[in-house]
């Protein structure tokens, strides 16, 4: 059993291709074929189904979740699908980090994950699938301020004439993070929390006013207008954290969770079959939840 434990941890937690571990074992006198490993994984895969269901059931008891998705390769032909591009979805909450490998990036995927729930908050980027899911399920979306910050940094890097203007917005966002951190530090003190919440609210109102003024400026650069239009359009979701202090300002939690799997994707190129893709998602879920 220790051999299988090492194989699973080495590949799915540390992201190392299995053949490298097998080569190192062979140098120590232990010759295990890749076919033996694949057959063993196929035998083990169904054993984790009850555990995956338990993780899902437990996660459904939470009130909010971080969600993200990234590309993945699955090298088994699927009827009706022209490419081998699949998607690794991650849902992170206080109780679990749940991974799901699916052939689609459509809203139907997160809708299926949250099936049976009638309310909740999903912290996510501005991808349209989450918006459709929220409308279908009646969920609330909390959008990511880190993505907004990146919008302004991209402007600063791509348009020298907008650098000072863009970095002023980056500074405003930094102040927002600081003020929110200060208010969260005094949650146990009702008076101090109310005072610091008012400070955050005033800063948000100031940012909102700056946004409106920029959009009223007919001379505003088109690239800057696009960023400001998005900011205004997503403002409600970017403000959810005010009424829900347990909601983070960004989706870094989900993005951090998927970093290890992304390293694995680069090292072993994806999954050779559908069952191995499902096993991969199970192993990511178990190992990263328990890590």
Give the predicted meaning of each segment.
Residues 1-291:
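Catalytic center-proximal scaffold of phosphoryl-transfer enzymes
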């Amino acid at each position: 059993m220790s051999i299988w434990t090492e194989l699973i941890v080495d590949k799915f937690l540390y992201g190392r291709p299995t053949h490298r571990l097998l080569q190192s074992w062979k140098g120590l006198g232990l010759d295990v074929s890749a076919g033996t490993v694949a057959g063993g994984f196929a035998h083990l895969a169904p054993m984790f189904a009850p555990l995956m269901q338990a993780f899902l059931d437990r996660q459904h008891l939470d009130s909010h979740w971080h969600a993200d998705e990234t590309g993945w390769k699955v090298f088994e032909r699927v009827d009706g699908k022209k490419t081998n591009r699949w998607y690794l979805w991650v849902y992170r909450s206080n109780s679990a980090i749940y991974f799901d490998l699916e052939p689609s990036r459509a809203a139907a995927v997160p809708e299926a994950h949250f099936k049976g729930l009638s309310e909740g908050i999903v912290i996510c980027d501005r991808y349209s699938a989450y918006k459709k899911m929220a409308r279908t399920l009646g969920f609330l979306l909390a959008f990511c301020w880190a993505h907004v910050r990146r919008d302004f940094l991209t402007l600063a890097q791509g348009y020298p004439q907008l650098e000072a203007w863009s970095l002023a917005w980056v500074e405003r966002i930094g102040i927002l993070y600081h003020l929110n951190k200060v208010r969260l530090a005094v949650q146990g003190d009702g008076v101090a929390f109310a005072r610091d919440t008012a400070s955050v609210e005033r800063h948000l109102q100031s940012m909102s006013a700056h946004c409106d003024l920029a959009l009223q400026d007919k001379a505003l650069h088109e690239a800057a207008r696009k960023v400001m239009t998005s900011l205004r359009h997503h403002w409600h979701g970017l403000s959810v954290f005010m009424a829900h202090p347990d909601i983070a300002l960004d989706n870094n939690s989900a993005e951090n969770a998927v970093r290890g799997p992304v390293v694995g994707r680069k090292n072993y190129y994806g999954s050779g079959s559908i069952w191995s893709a499902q096993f991969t998602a199970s192993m990511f879920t178990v190992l990263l939840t328990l890590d």
